[in-house]
Amino acid sequence: MIPDVSQALAWLEKHPQALKGIQRGLERETLRVNADGSLATTGHPESLGSALTHKWITTDFAEALLEFITPVDGDIDHMLTLMRDVHRYTARQLGDERMWPLSMPCYIEQGQDIELAQYGTSNIGRLKTLYREGLKNRYGALMQTISGVHYNFSLPMAFWQAKCGETDKEAISAGYFRLIRNYYRFGWVIPYLFGASPAICSSFLQGKPTTLPFEKTDCGMYYLPYATSLRLSDLGYTNKSQSNLGITFNDLHEYVAGLKRAIKTPSEEYETIGLEKDGKRLQINSNVLQIENELYAPIRPKRVTRSGEAPSDALERGGIEYIEVRSLDINPFSPIGVDEQQIRFLDLFMVWCVLADAPEMSSDELLCTRTNWNRVILEGRKPGLTLGIGCETAQFPLAKVGKDLFRDLKRVAQTMDSLYGGEEYQKVCDQLVESFDNPELTFSARILRSMIDQGIGGTGRTLAAQYRDMLQQEPLEVLSEEDFVAEREASIARQREVEAGDTESFEAFLAKHA
């Protein structure tokens, strides 16, 4: 089931320097909650500066949904330490509030008014809030409070020069699309190993019927005994109306055209919401996607955008610059929601995905890959579970496929370790491969044991309090208090500048973006 990568691995072993200069970045979302686990109803703390323009600390869907961002970094340890510093500083600014350590929210009641993230009075700030209003009206606010971690990854120019003999945008984009196709085919390994949302609070179902065979604890927790990541399931944030958009990952121009088409495709379902009610705007437009970011995807091709530029225009201009992996649940065993082992695994898996042969993929096959993901998401730890290839009928044991994959990853790890020194990458392979023979070692199995014992609420509250105390007590390491104060002031000044620079009404601005 695994493609033959022996030739590509032999090439890599001869060209280890091609991997020198891998760049990464992290984004972590987390809800601000009170000591009892309920959602904080306070505004974004003033001491954290402007959520519109701060370079490390912003908000996602809700005013209480923090998002922490690291700059692009070539050093894993430095990136994780900076992320920890952002958590340490924030923990000291939150008073008695703390950061929810799980992907799935718990203490949010049906119909509770969740305040949307606010970004000030500028046109762009108001558009961001209106986009969130649209998300709320389309999918419900609760779905939008699910948190995750995003891992951004790029290969150095030296890799593309050595592998393709050229570094033009077409060659590099083709290489990243190969990575993406392999990710769709084999990325289910990420929720298998690191999925950490095998259960939900009953409030999350909002009284709606479900076809999933949930088991229920006395405290009202719903769980699937072999599930890995309900965050990635249809219970989480997936958009069924997007499944037939026909967006594919074979060619840059084809992908961009598909994305632009989706933005302009009207949706009967969303037309029924309307654009305005009682003078209040309800969504940017009634198309399948209000803006490109609404496209649900476990992985995205990206390029840093210029001011006012749409993501697809940036891709068309310069090709793919980096990849955003979006399938990581919050790691509940880390105060910062992610750890070094995960980053090293993702490095290895990304390199494998770009090396392994990846035939072009029709939109039909793309839908078929969802079958494997769903199996792993809902019953990944089930003994004897099998997976298929694309739309074919042949089935293969997950445990065997996983071990075959890790045989390849071990060779990539040896190359990475020879380049960077030490044996850290190989150690990660040795630790994680055991999870295929013993699923109890996976994140989902470990956290489910705690949840069955304490409930989701109890587990979340205990970890939130523990991490709050830990982070508040730890000294800052790579950033200083002065850095945070300076960035707070600078971000507020940047927001004021944006607001002062607006030259047109919001209506005129919106007309250009709708």
Swiss-Prot record:
GO terms for cellular component: cytosol. One of its GO terms (biological process) is glutathione biosynthetic process. One of its GO terms (molecular function) is glutamate-cysteine ligase activity. Pathway: Sulfur metabolism; glutathione biosynthesis; glutathione from L-cysteine and L-glutamate: step 1/2. It catalyses: L-cysteine + L-glutamate + ATP = gamma-L-glutamyl-L-cysteine + ADP + phosphate + H(+). InterPro entries: Gln_synth/guanido_kin_cat_dom, Glu_cys_ligase, Glut_cys_ligase. It holds the Pfam family Glu_cys_ligase. Its EC number is 6.3.2.2. Keywords: ATP-binding, Glutathione biosynthesis, Ligase, Nucleotide-binding. NCBIfam families: glu_cys_ligase (TIGR01434). Belongs to the glutamate--cysteine ligase type 1 family. Type 1 subfamily. This is Glutamate--cysteine ligase. It comes from Enterobacter sp. (strain 638). The lineage of its organism: Bacteria, Pseudomonadati, Pseudomonadota, Gammaproteobacteria, Enterobacterales. The gene is gshA.
